Amino acid sequence: MDLYSTPAAALDRFVARRLQPRKEFVEKARRALGALAAALRERGGRLGAAAPRVLKTVKGGSSGRGTALKGGCDSELVIFLDCFKSYVDQRARRAEILSEMRASLESWWQNPVPGLRLTFPEQSVPGALQFRLTSVDLEDWMDVSLVPAFNVLGQAGSGVKPKPQVYSTLLNSGCQGGEHAACFTELRRNFVNIRPAKLKNLILLVKHWYHQVCLQGLWKETLPPVYALELLTIFAWEQGCKKDAFSLAEGLRTVLGLIQQHQHLCVFWTVNYGFEDPAVGQFLQRQLKRPRPVILDPADPTWDLGNGAAWHWDLLAQEAASCYDHPCFLRGMGDPVQSWKGPGLPRAGCSGLGHPIQLDPNQKTPENSKSLNAVYPRAGSKPPSCPAPGPTGAASIVPSVPGMALDLSQIPTKELDRFIQDHLKPSPQFQEQVKKAIDIILRCLHENCVHKASRVSKGGSFGRGTDLRDGCDVELIIFLNCFTDYKDQGPRRAEILDEMRAQLESWWQDQVPSLSLQFPEQNVPEALQFQLVSTALKSWTDVSLLPAFDAVGQLSSGTKPNPQVYSRLLTSGCQEGEHKACFAELRRNFMNIRPVKLKNLILLVKHWYRQVAAQNKGKGPAPASLPPAYALELLTIFAWEQGCRQDCFNMAQGFRTVLGLVQQHQQLCVYWTVNYSTEDPAMRMHLLGQLRKPRPLVLDPADPTWNVGHGSWELLAQEAAALGMQACFLSRDGTSVQPWDVMPALLYQTPAGDLDKFISEFLQPNRQFLAQVNKAVDTICSFLKENCFRNSPIKVIKVVKGGSSAKGTALRGRSDADLVVFLSCFSQFTEQGNKRAEIISEIRAQLEACQQERQFEVKFEVSKWENPRVLSFSLTSQTMLDQSVDFDVLPAFDALGQLVSGSRPSSQVYVDLIHSYSNAGEYSTCFTELQRDFIISRPTKLKSLIRLVKHWYQQCTKISKGRGSLPPQHGLELLTVYAWEQGGKDSQFNMAEGFRTVLELVTQYRQLCIYWTINYNAKDKTVGDFLKQQLQKPRPIILDPADPTGNLGHNARWDLLAKEAAACTSALCCMGRNGIPIQPWPVKAAV
């Protein structure tokens, strides 16, 4: 996370440069919303007929509160109408008014605001009309909700408290929590807007942290709303600071501390409502008895933003607990930043909050008010104890029993970060002693040895920062002037090591009083081995002293070695990894640039590795025959790079991913080109030779001759599978923590000739699972057709499966599909949106009945996310938990009727579509059968190429996350079909050539103009005129062969995709065995 790597003193600059929105975009969006509000007032919010009058408009959301982040933000435009005389009126007329407002909005946008684009996403909030304003460069956007509302407050003056009747009426309306929050937007906005600018900067910092946590792959829907963190930030500032100028690092530290204490939080304000009115007072008492955390909206007491029963605050708390070692929480001298002190704020070493209540200054204090008894701990309960802080300032989660290994399998998922801090990180005191001892040893050798060193490098886990408590390893590489080549090291090594040992034995006499130096049996010919032992701290370190040839020389940070270094190594005739000591510095630098939390994950993996070795000593392979622990370090870095790349992440997810890769050891192919690469011909041939060797292959990033993957992985794989079902991988709701999406080999590192094997091994779904899914879908479709709308004139005409699963291009793992339900109640395209909530409700009920009444070979789950406009379910393998298909259920108008396979639809279908549509591809679900048939009829090998392209595309989405929307994946499928058709239509083509052709077309996106006429053409005048219009639009153009309104090339970041495509063309996957680039087919970018 970029925030974590920012020094505490630089956070103000970080907020100003990285988080505050661009003024130009803010001003354009403000003008646009102002003009829209004026237009709605003029038109009364309706077109034609007698229109309700707009009483006032209020801008809310983060944009209205002044807490909008750069990039993407939200805004609420609340339209108060005179036709609403009560809260209840809003429900009755909302749909009608929203429909008319959309018409007004579309009419108003006929004259667009320069520099902005307006788009309508899928409408997922029943009480609002949602649209997005995007800058033309696609760097900034604002999600706007247009909300019609009851003007309960009237023209309230600033700072004036609403009448209690406002809230008693709200409570009597029978509303859900926060249902009418829009009515109080003005109060909510004013509550934040009076705050100092720096407090709003702190809010931006907290929100940025929250969004980074969301990017880790956690389900954003399960986390509390970000507005809850805005309120928590204000609470922290009020209780601990209340100054206009303060340290952002201290403020952030305080807010994260509160998040850790979420189970004790009870926060509310009485600036707008209070206990004076009996009805409101009784309601507040009930609210304050809710599960913690409780964070009441200061404008609407029915809205509990904390909602401890619903949101996963523990996920945020877990991340908060693990981030205090980062530079943003360290002062210039390395001292930790302290949090603010105050009532209701966490205290060092305490597990609770002293005073978790926030009151208005004019409100009676708890001591003087009988109304507040409900917020105190229940009778008989004791306040949280406050133990004396230990060395880390926190109580240990697992009692330390001398001589007993901690059972990792029983550590709860959310406690893994603390487990690492308390039990795996080495003692700072012992580390200091070792550093002191090493300095003394090096001084001794420098002053007394005959053979002089040019320089020294510290390696091993100690040098890399991955050393465990209770024992680590250090490599001291002594680069000697007498070695001028790799071959010089062998003949003189024994003599030099004997001299070094003699010097150490004679010179070491209690040089570090707390440490003893011991020489074990010497079993590594190229090194002098000894131990530094601290009896008092019960810790030791194994030290290896290695004289070596300085092959690399003094390199500045980030500089690649001269290719000649490695060409000399390859021609030296060395054994595998024989000269790895010469590259210790590169190895250390490769690891040291990694974030703190990744190193913590490495510690966890190594601790597990040690436990496996210790528990199975004498039962199976000896620990020496296991792969080296360093192989697990590299595998952990590989997992993080490919699956996460965030400074903060879920520790259990990372751990599970590494264990998953261990289980796939027979397919592991892992290497890096940070120090050596395929640009040098000799190195390219060497790497290609390495890639032809049996798996696992885990090449050292510093020494390409050293495959650290050698060893017996079977025992590790068995133990990894056994650990997968233990407590350390179970989330709070009892479900298994899901690993990151990481494969044991990378596309870019796969030779072109091995692409077919890559697809079959890693991309093709399991055939048994696909058969089970198809059988389950057939059962579900039949059930829905027979049982939906039994006592209704509505009939299910047919149910059609769409998406990649239906087309035969699904990828292994988690894929998406559509189940389109064609209904008789829709007689034209524009009716599809009618009765959607009612129809979805009926289909949901029947899906749940099907789930209960039918037997399935796969796990069938209907989504619990009860959005009245969206319905989804998933089918998951019972035996392979990473294999699943997520289905969206989509009601649709049967525009095509019973179409005979291979026949063309009537041109009238497309004439009606052209006259009906408002947004591109709006009714594409009606053409699902045609979309499916267009792909499913293609040769098997072309579908394999489509899988390869989709896999490449998904890797690109990880890289470009947060930088704008890439073109839709379906567009890449069509581009692949086009490349094959224009490239010769050979059913047994060269996979690398096909892939290379698609990449070439992506780089030529500015010229792309692709369409088909198998379903529609220009013979009908209306359709022909429309096609001409479509084809005259800016490139790229990729028209959906089933739906001519759908241009899959429009309004997306093709430039990002093109950049990745250009990079891929020089990778091994696009290069022949002789190092010559694969050539694309001769395909033009336009039809």
Curated annotation (Swiss-Prot):
Binding site for Mg(2+): 816, 818, 888
E.C. code: 2.7.7.84
Region listing for OAS domain 2, in residue ranges: 411-742
Reactions it catalyzes: 3 ATP = 5'-triphosphoadenylyl-(2'->5')-adenylyl-(2'->5')-adenosine + 2 diphosphate
GO MF annotation, one: double-stranded RNA binding
Signal peptide: none
Family indicated by similarity: Belongs to the 2-5A synthase family.
Protein's recorded name: 2'-5'-oligoadenylate synthase 3
Organism, as annotated: Homo sapiens
Top-level taxonomy: Eukaryota, Metazoa, Chordata, Craniata, Vertebrata
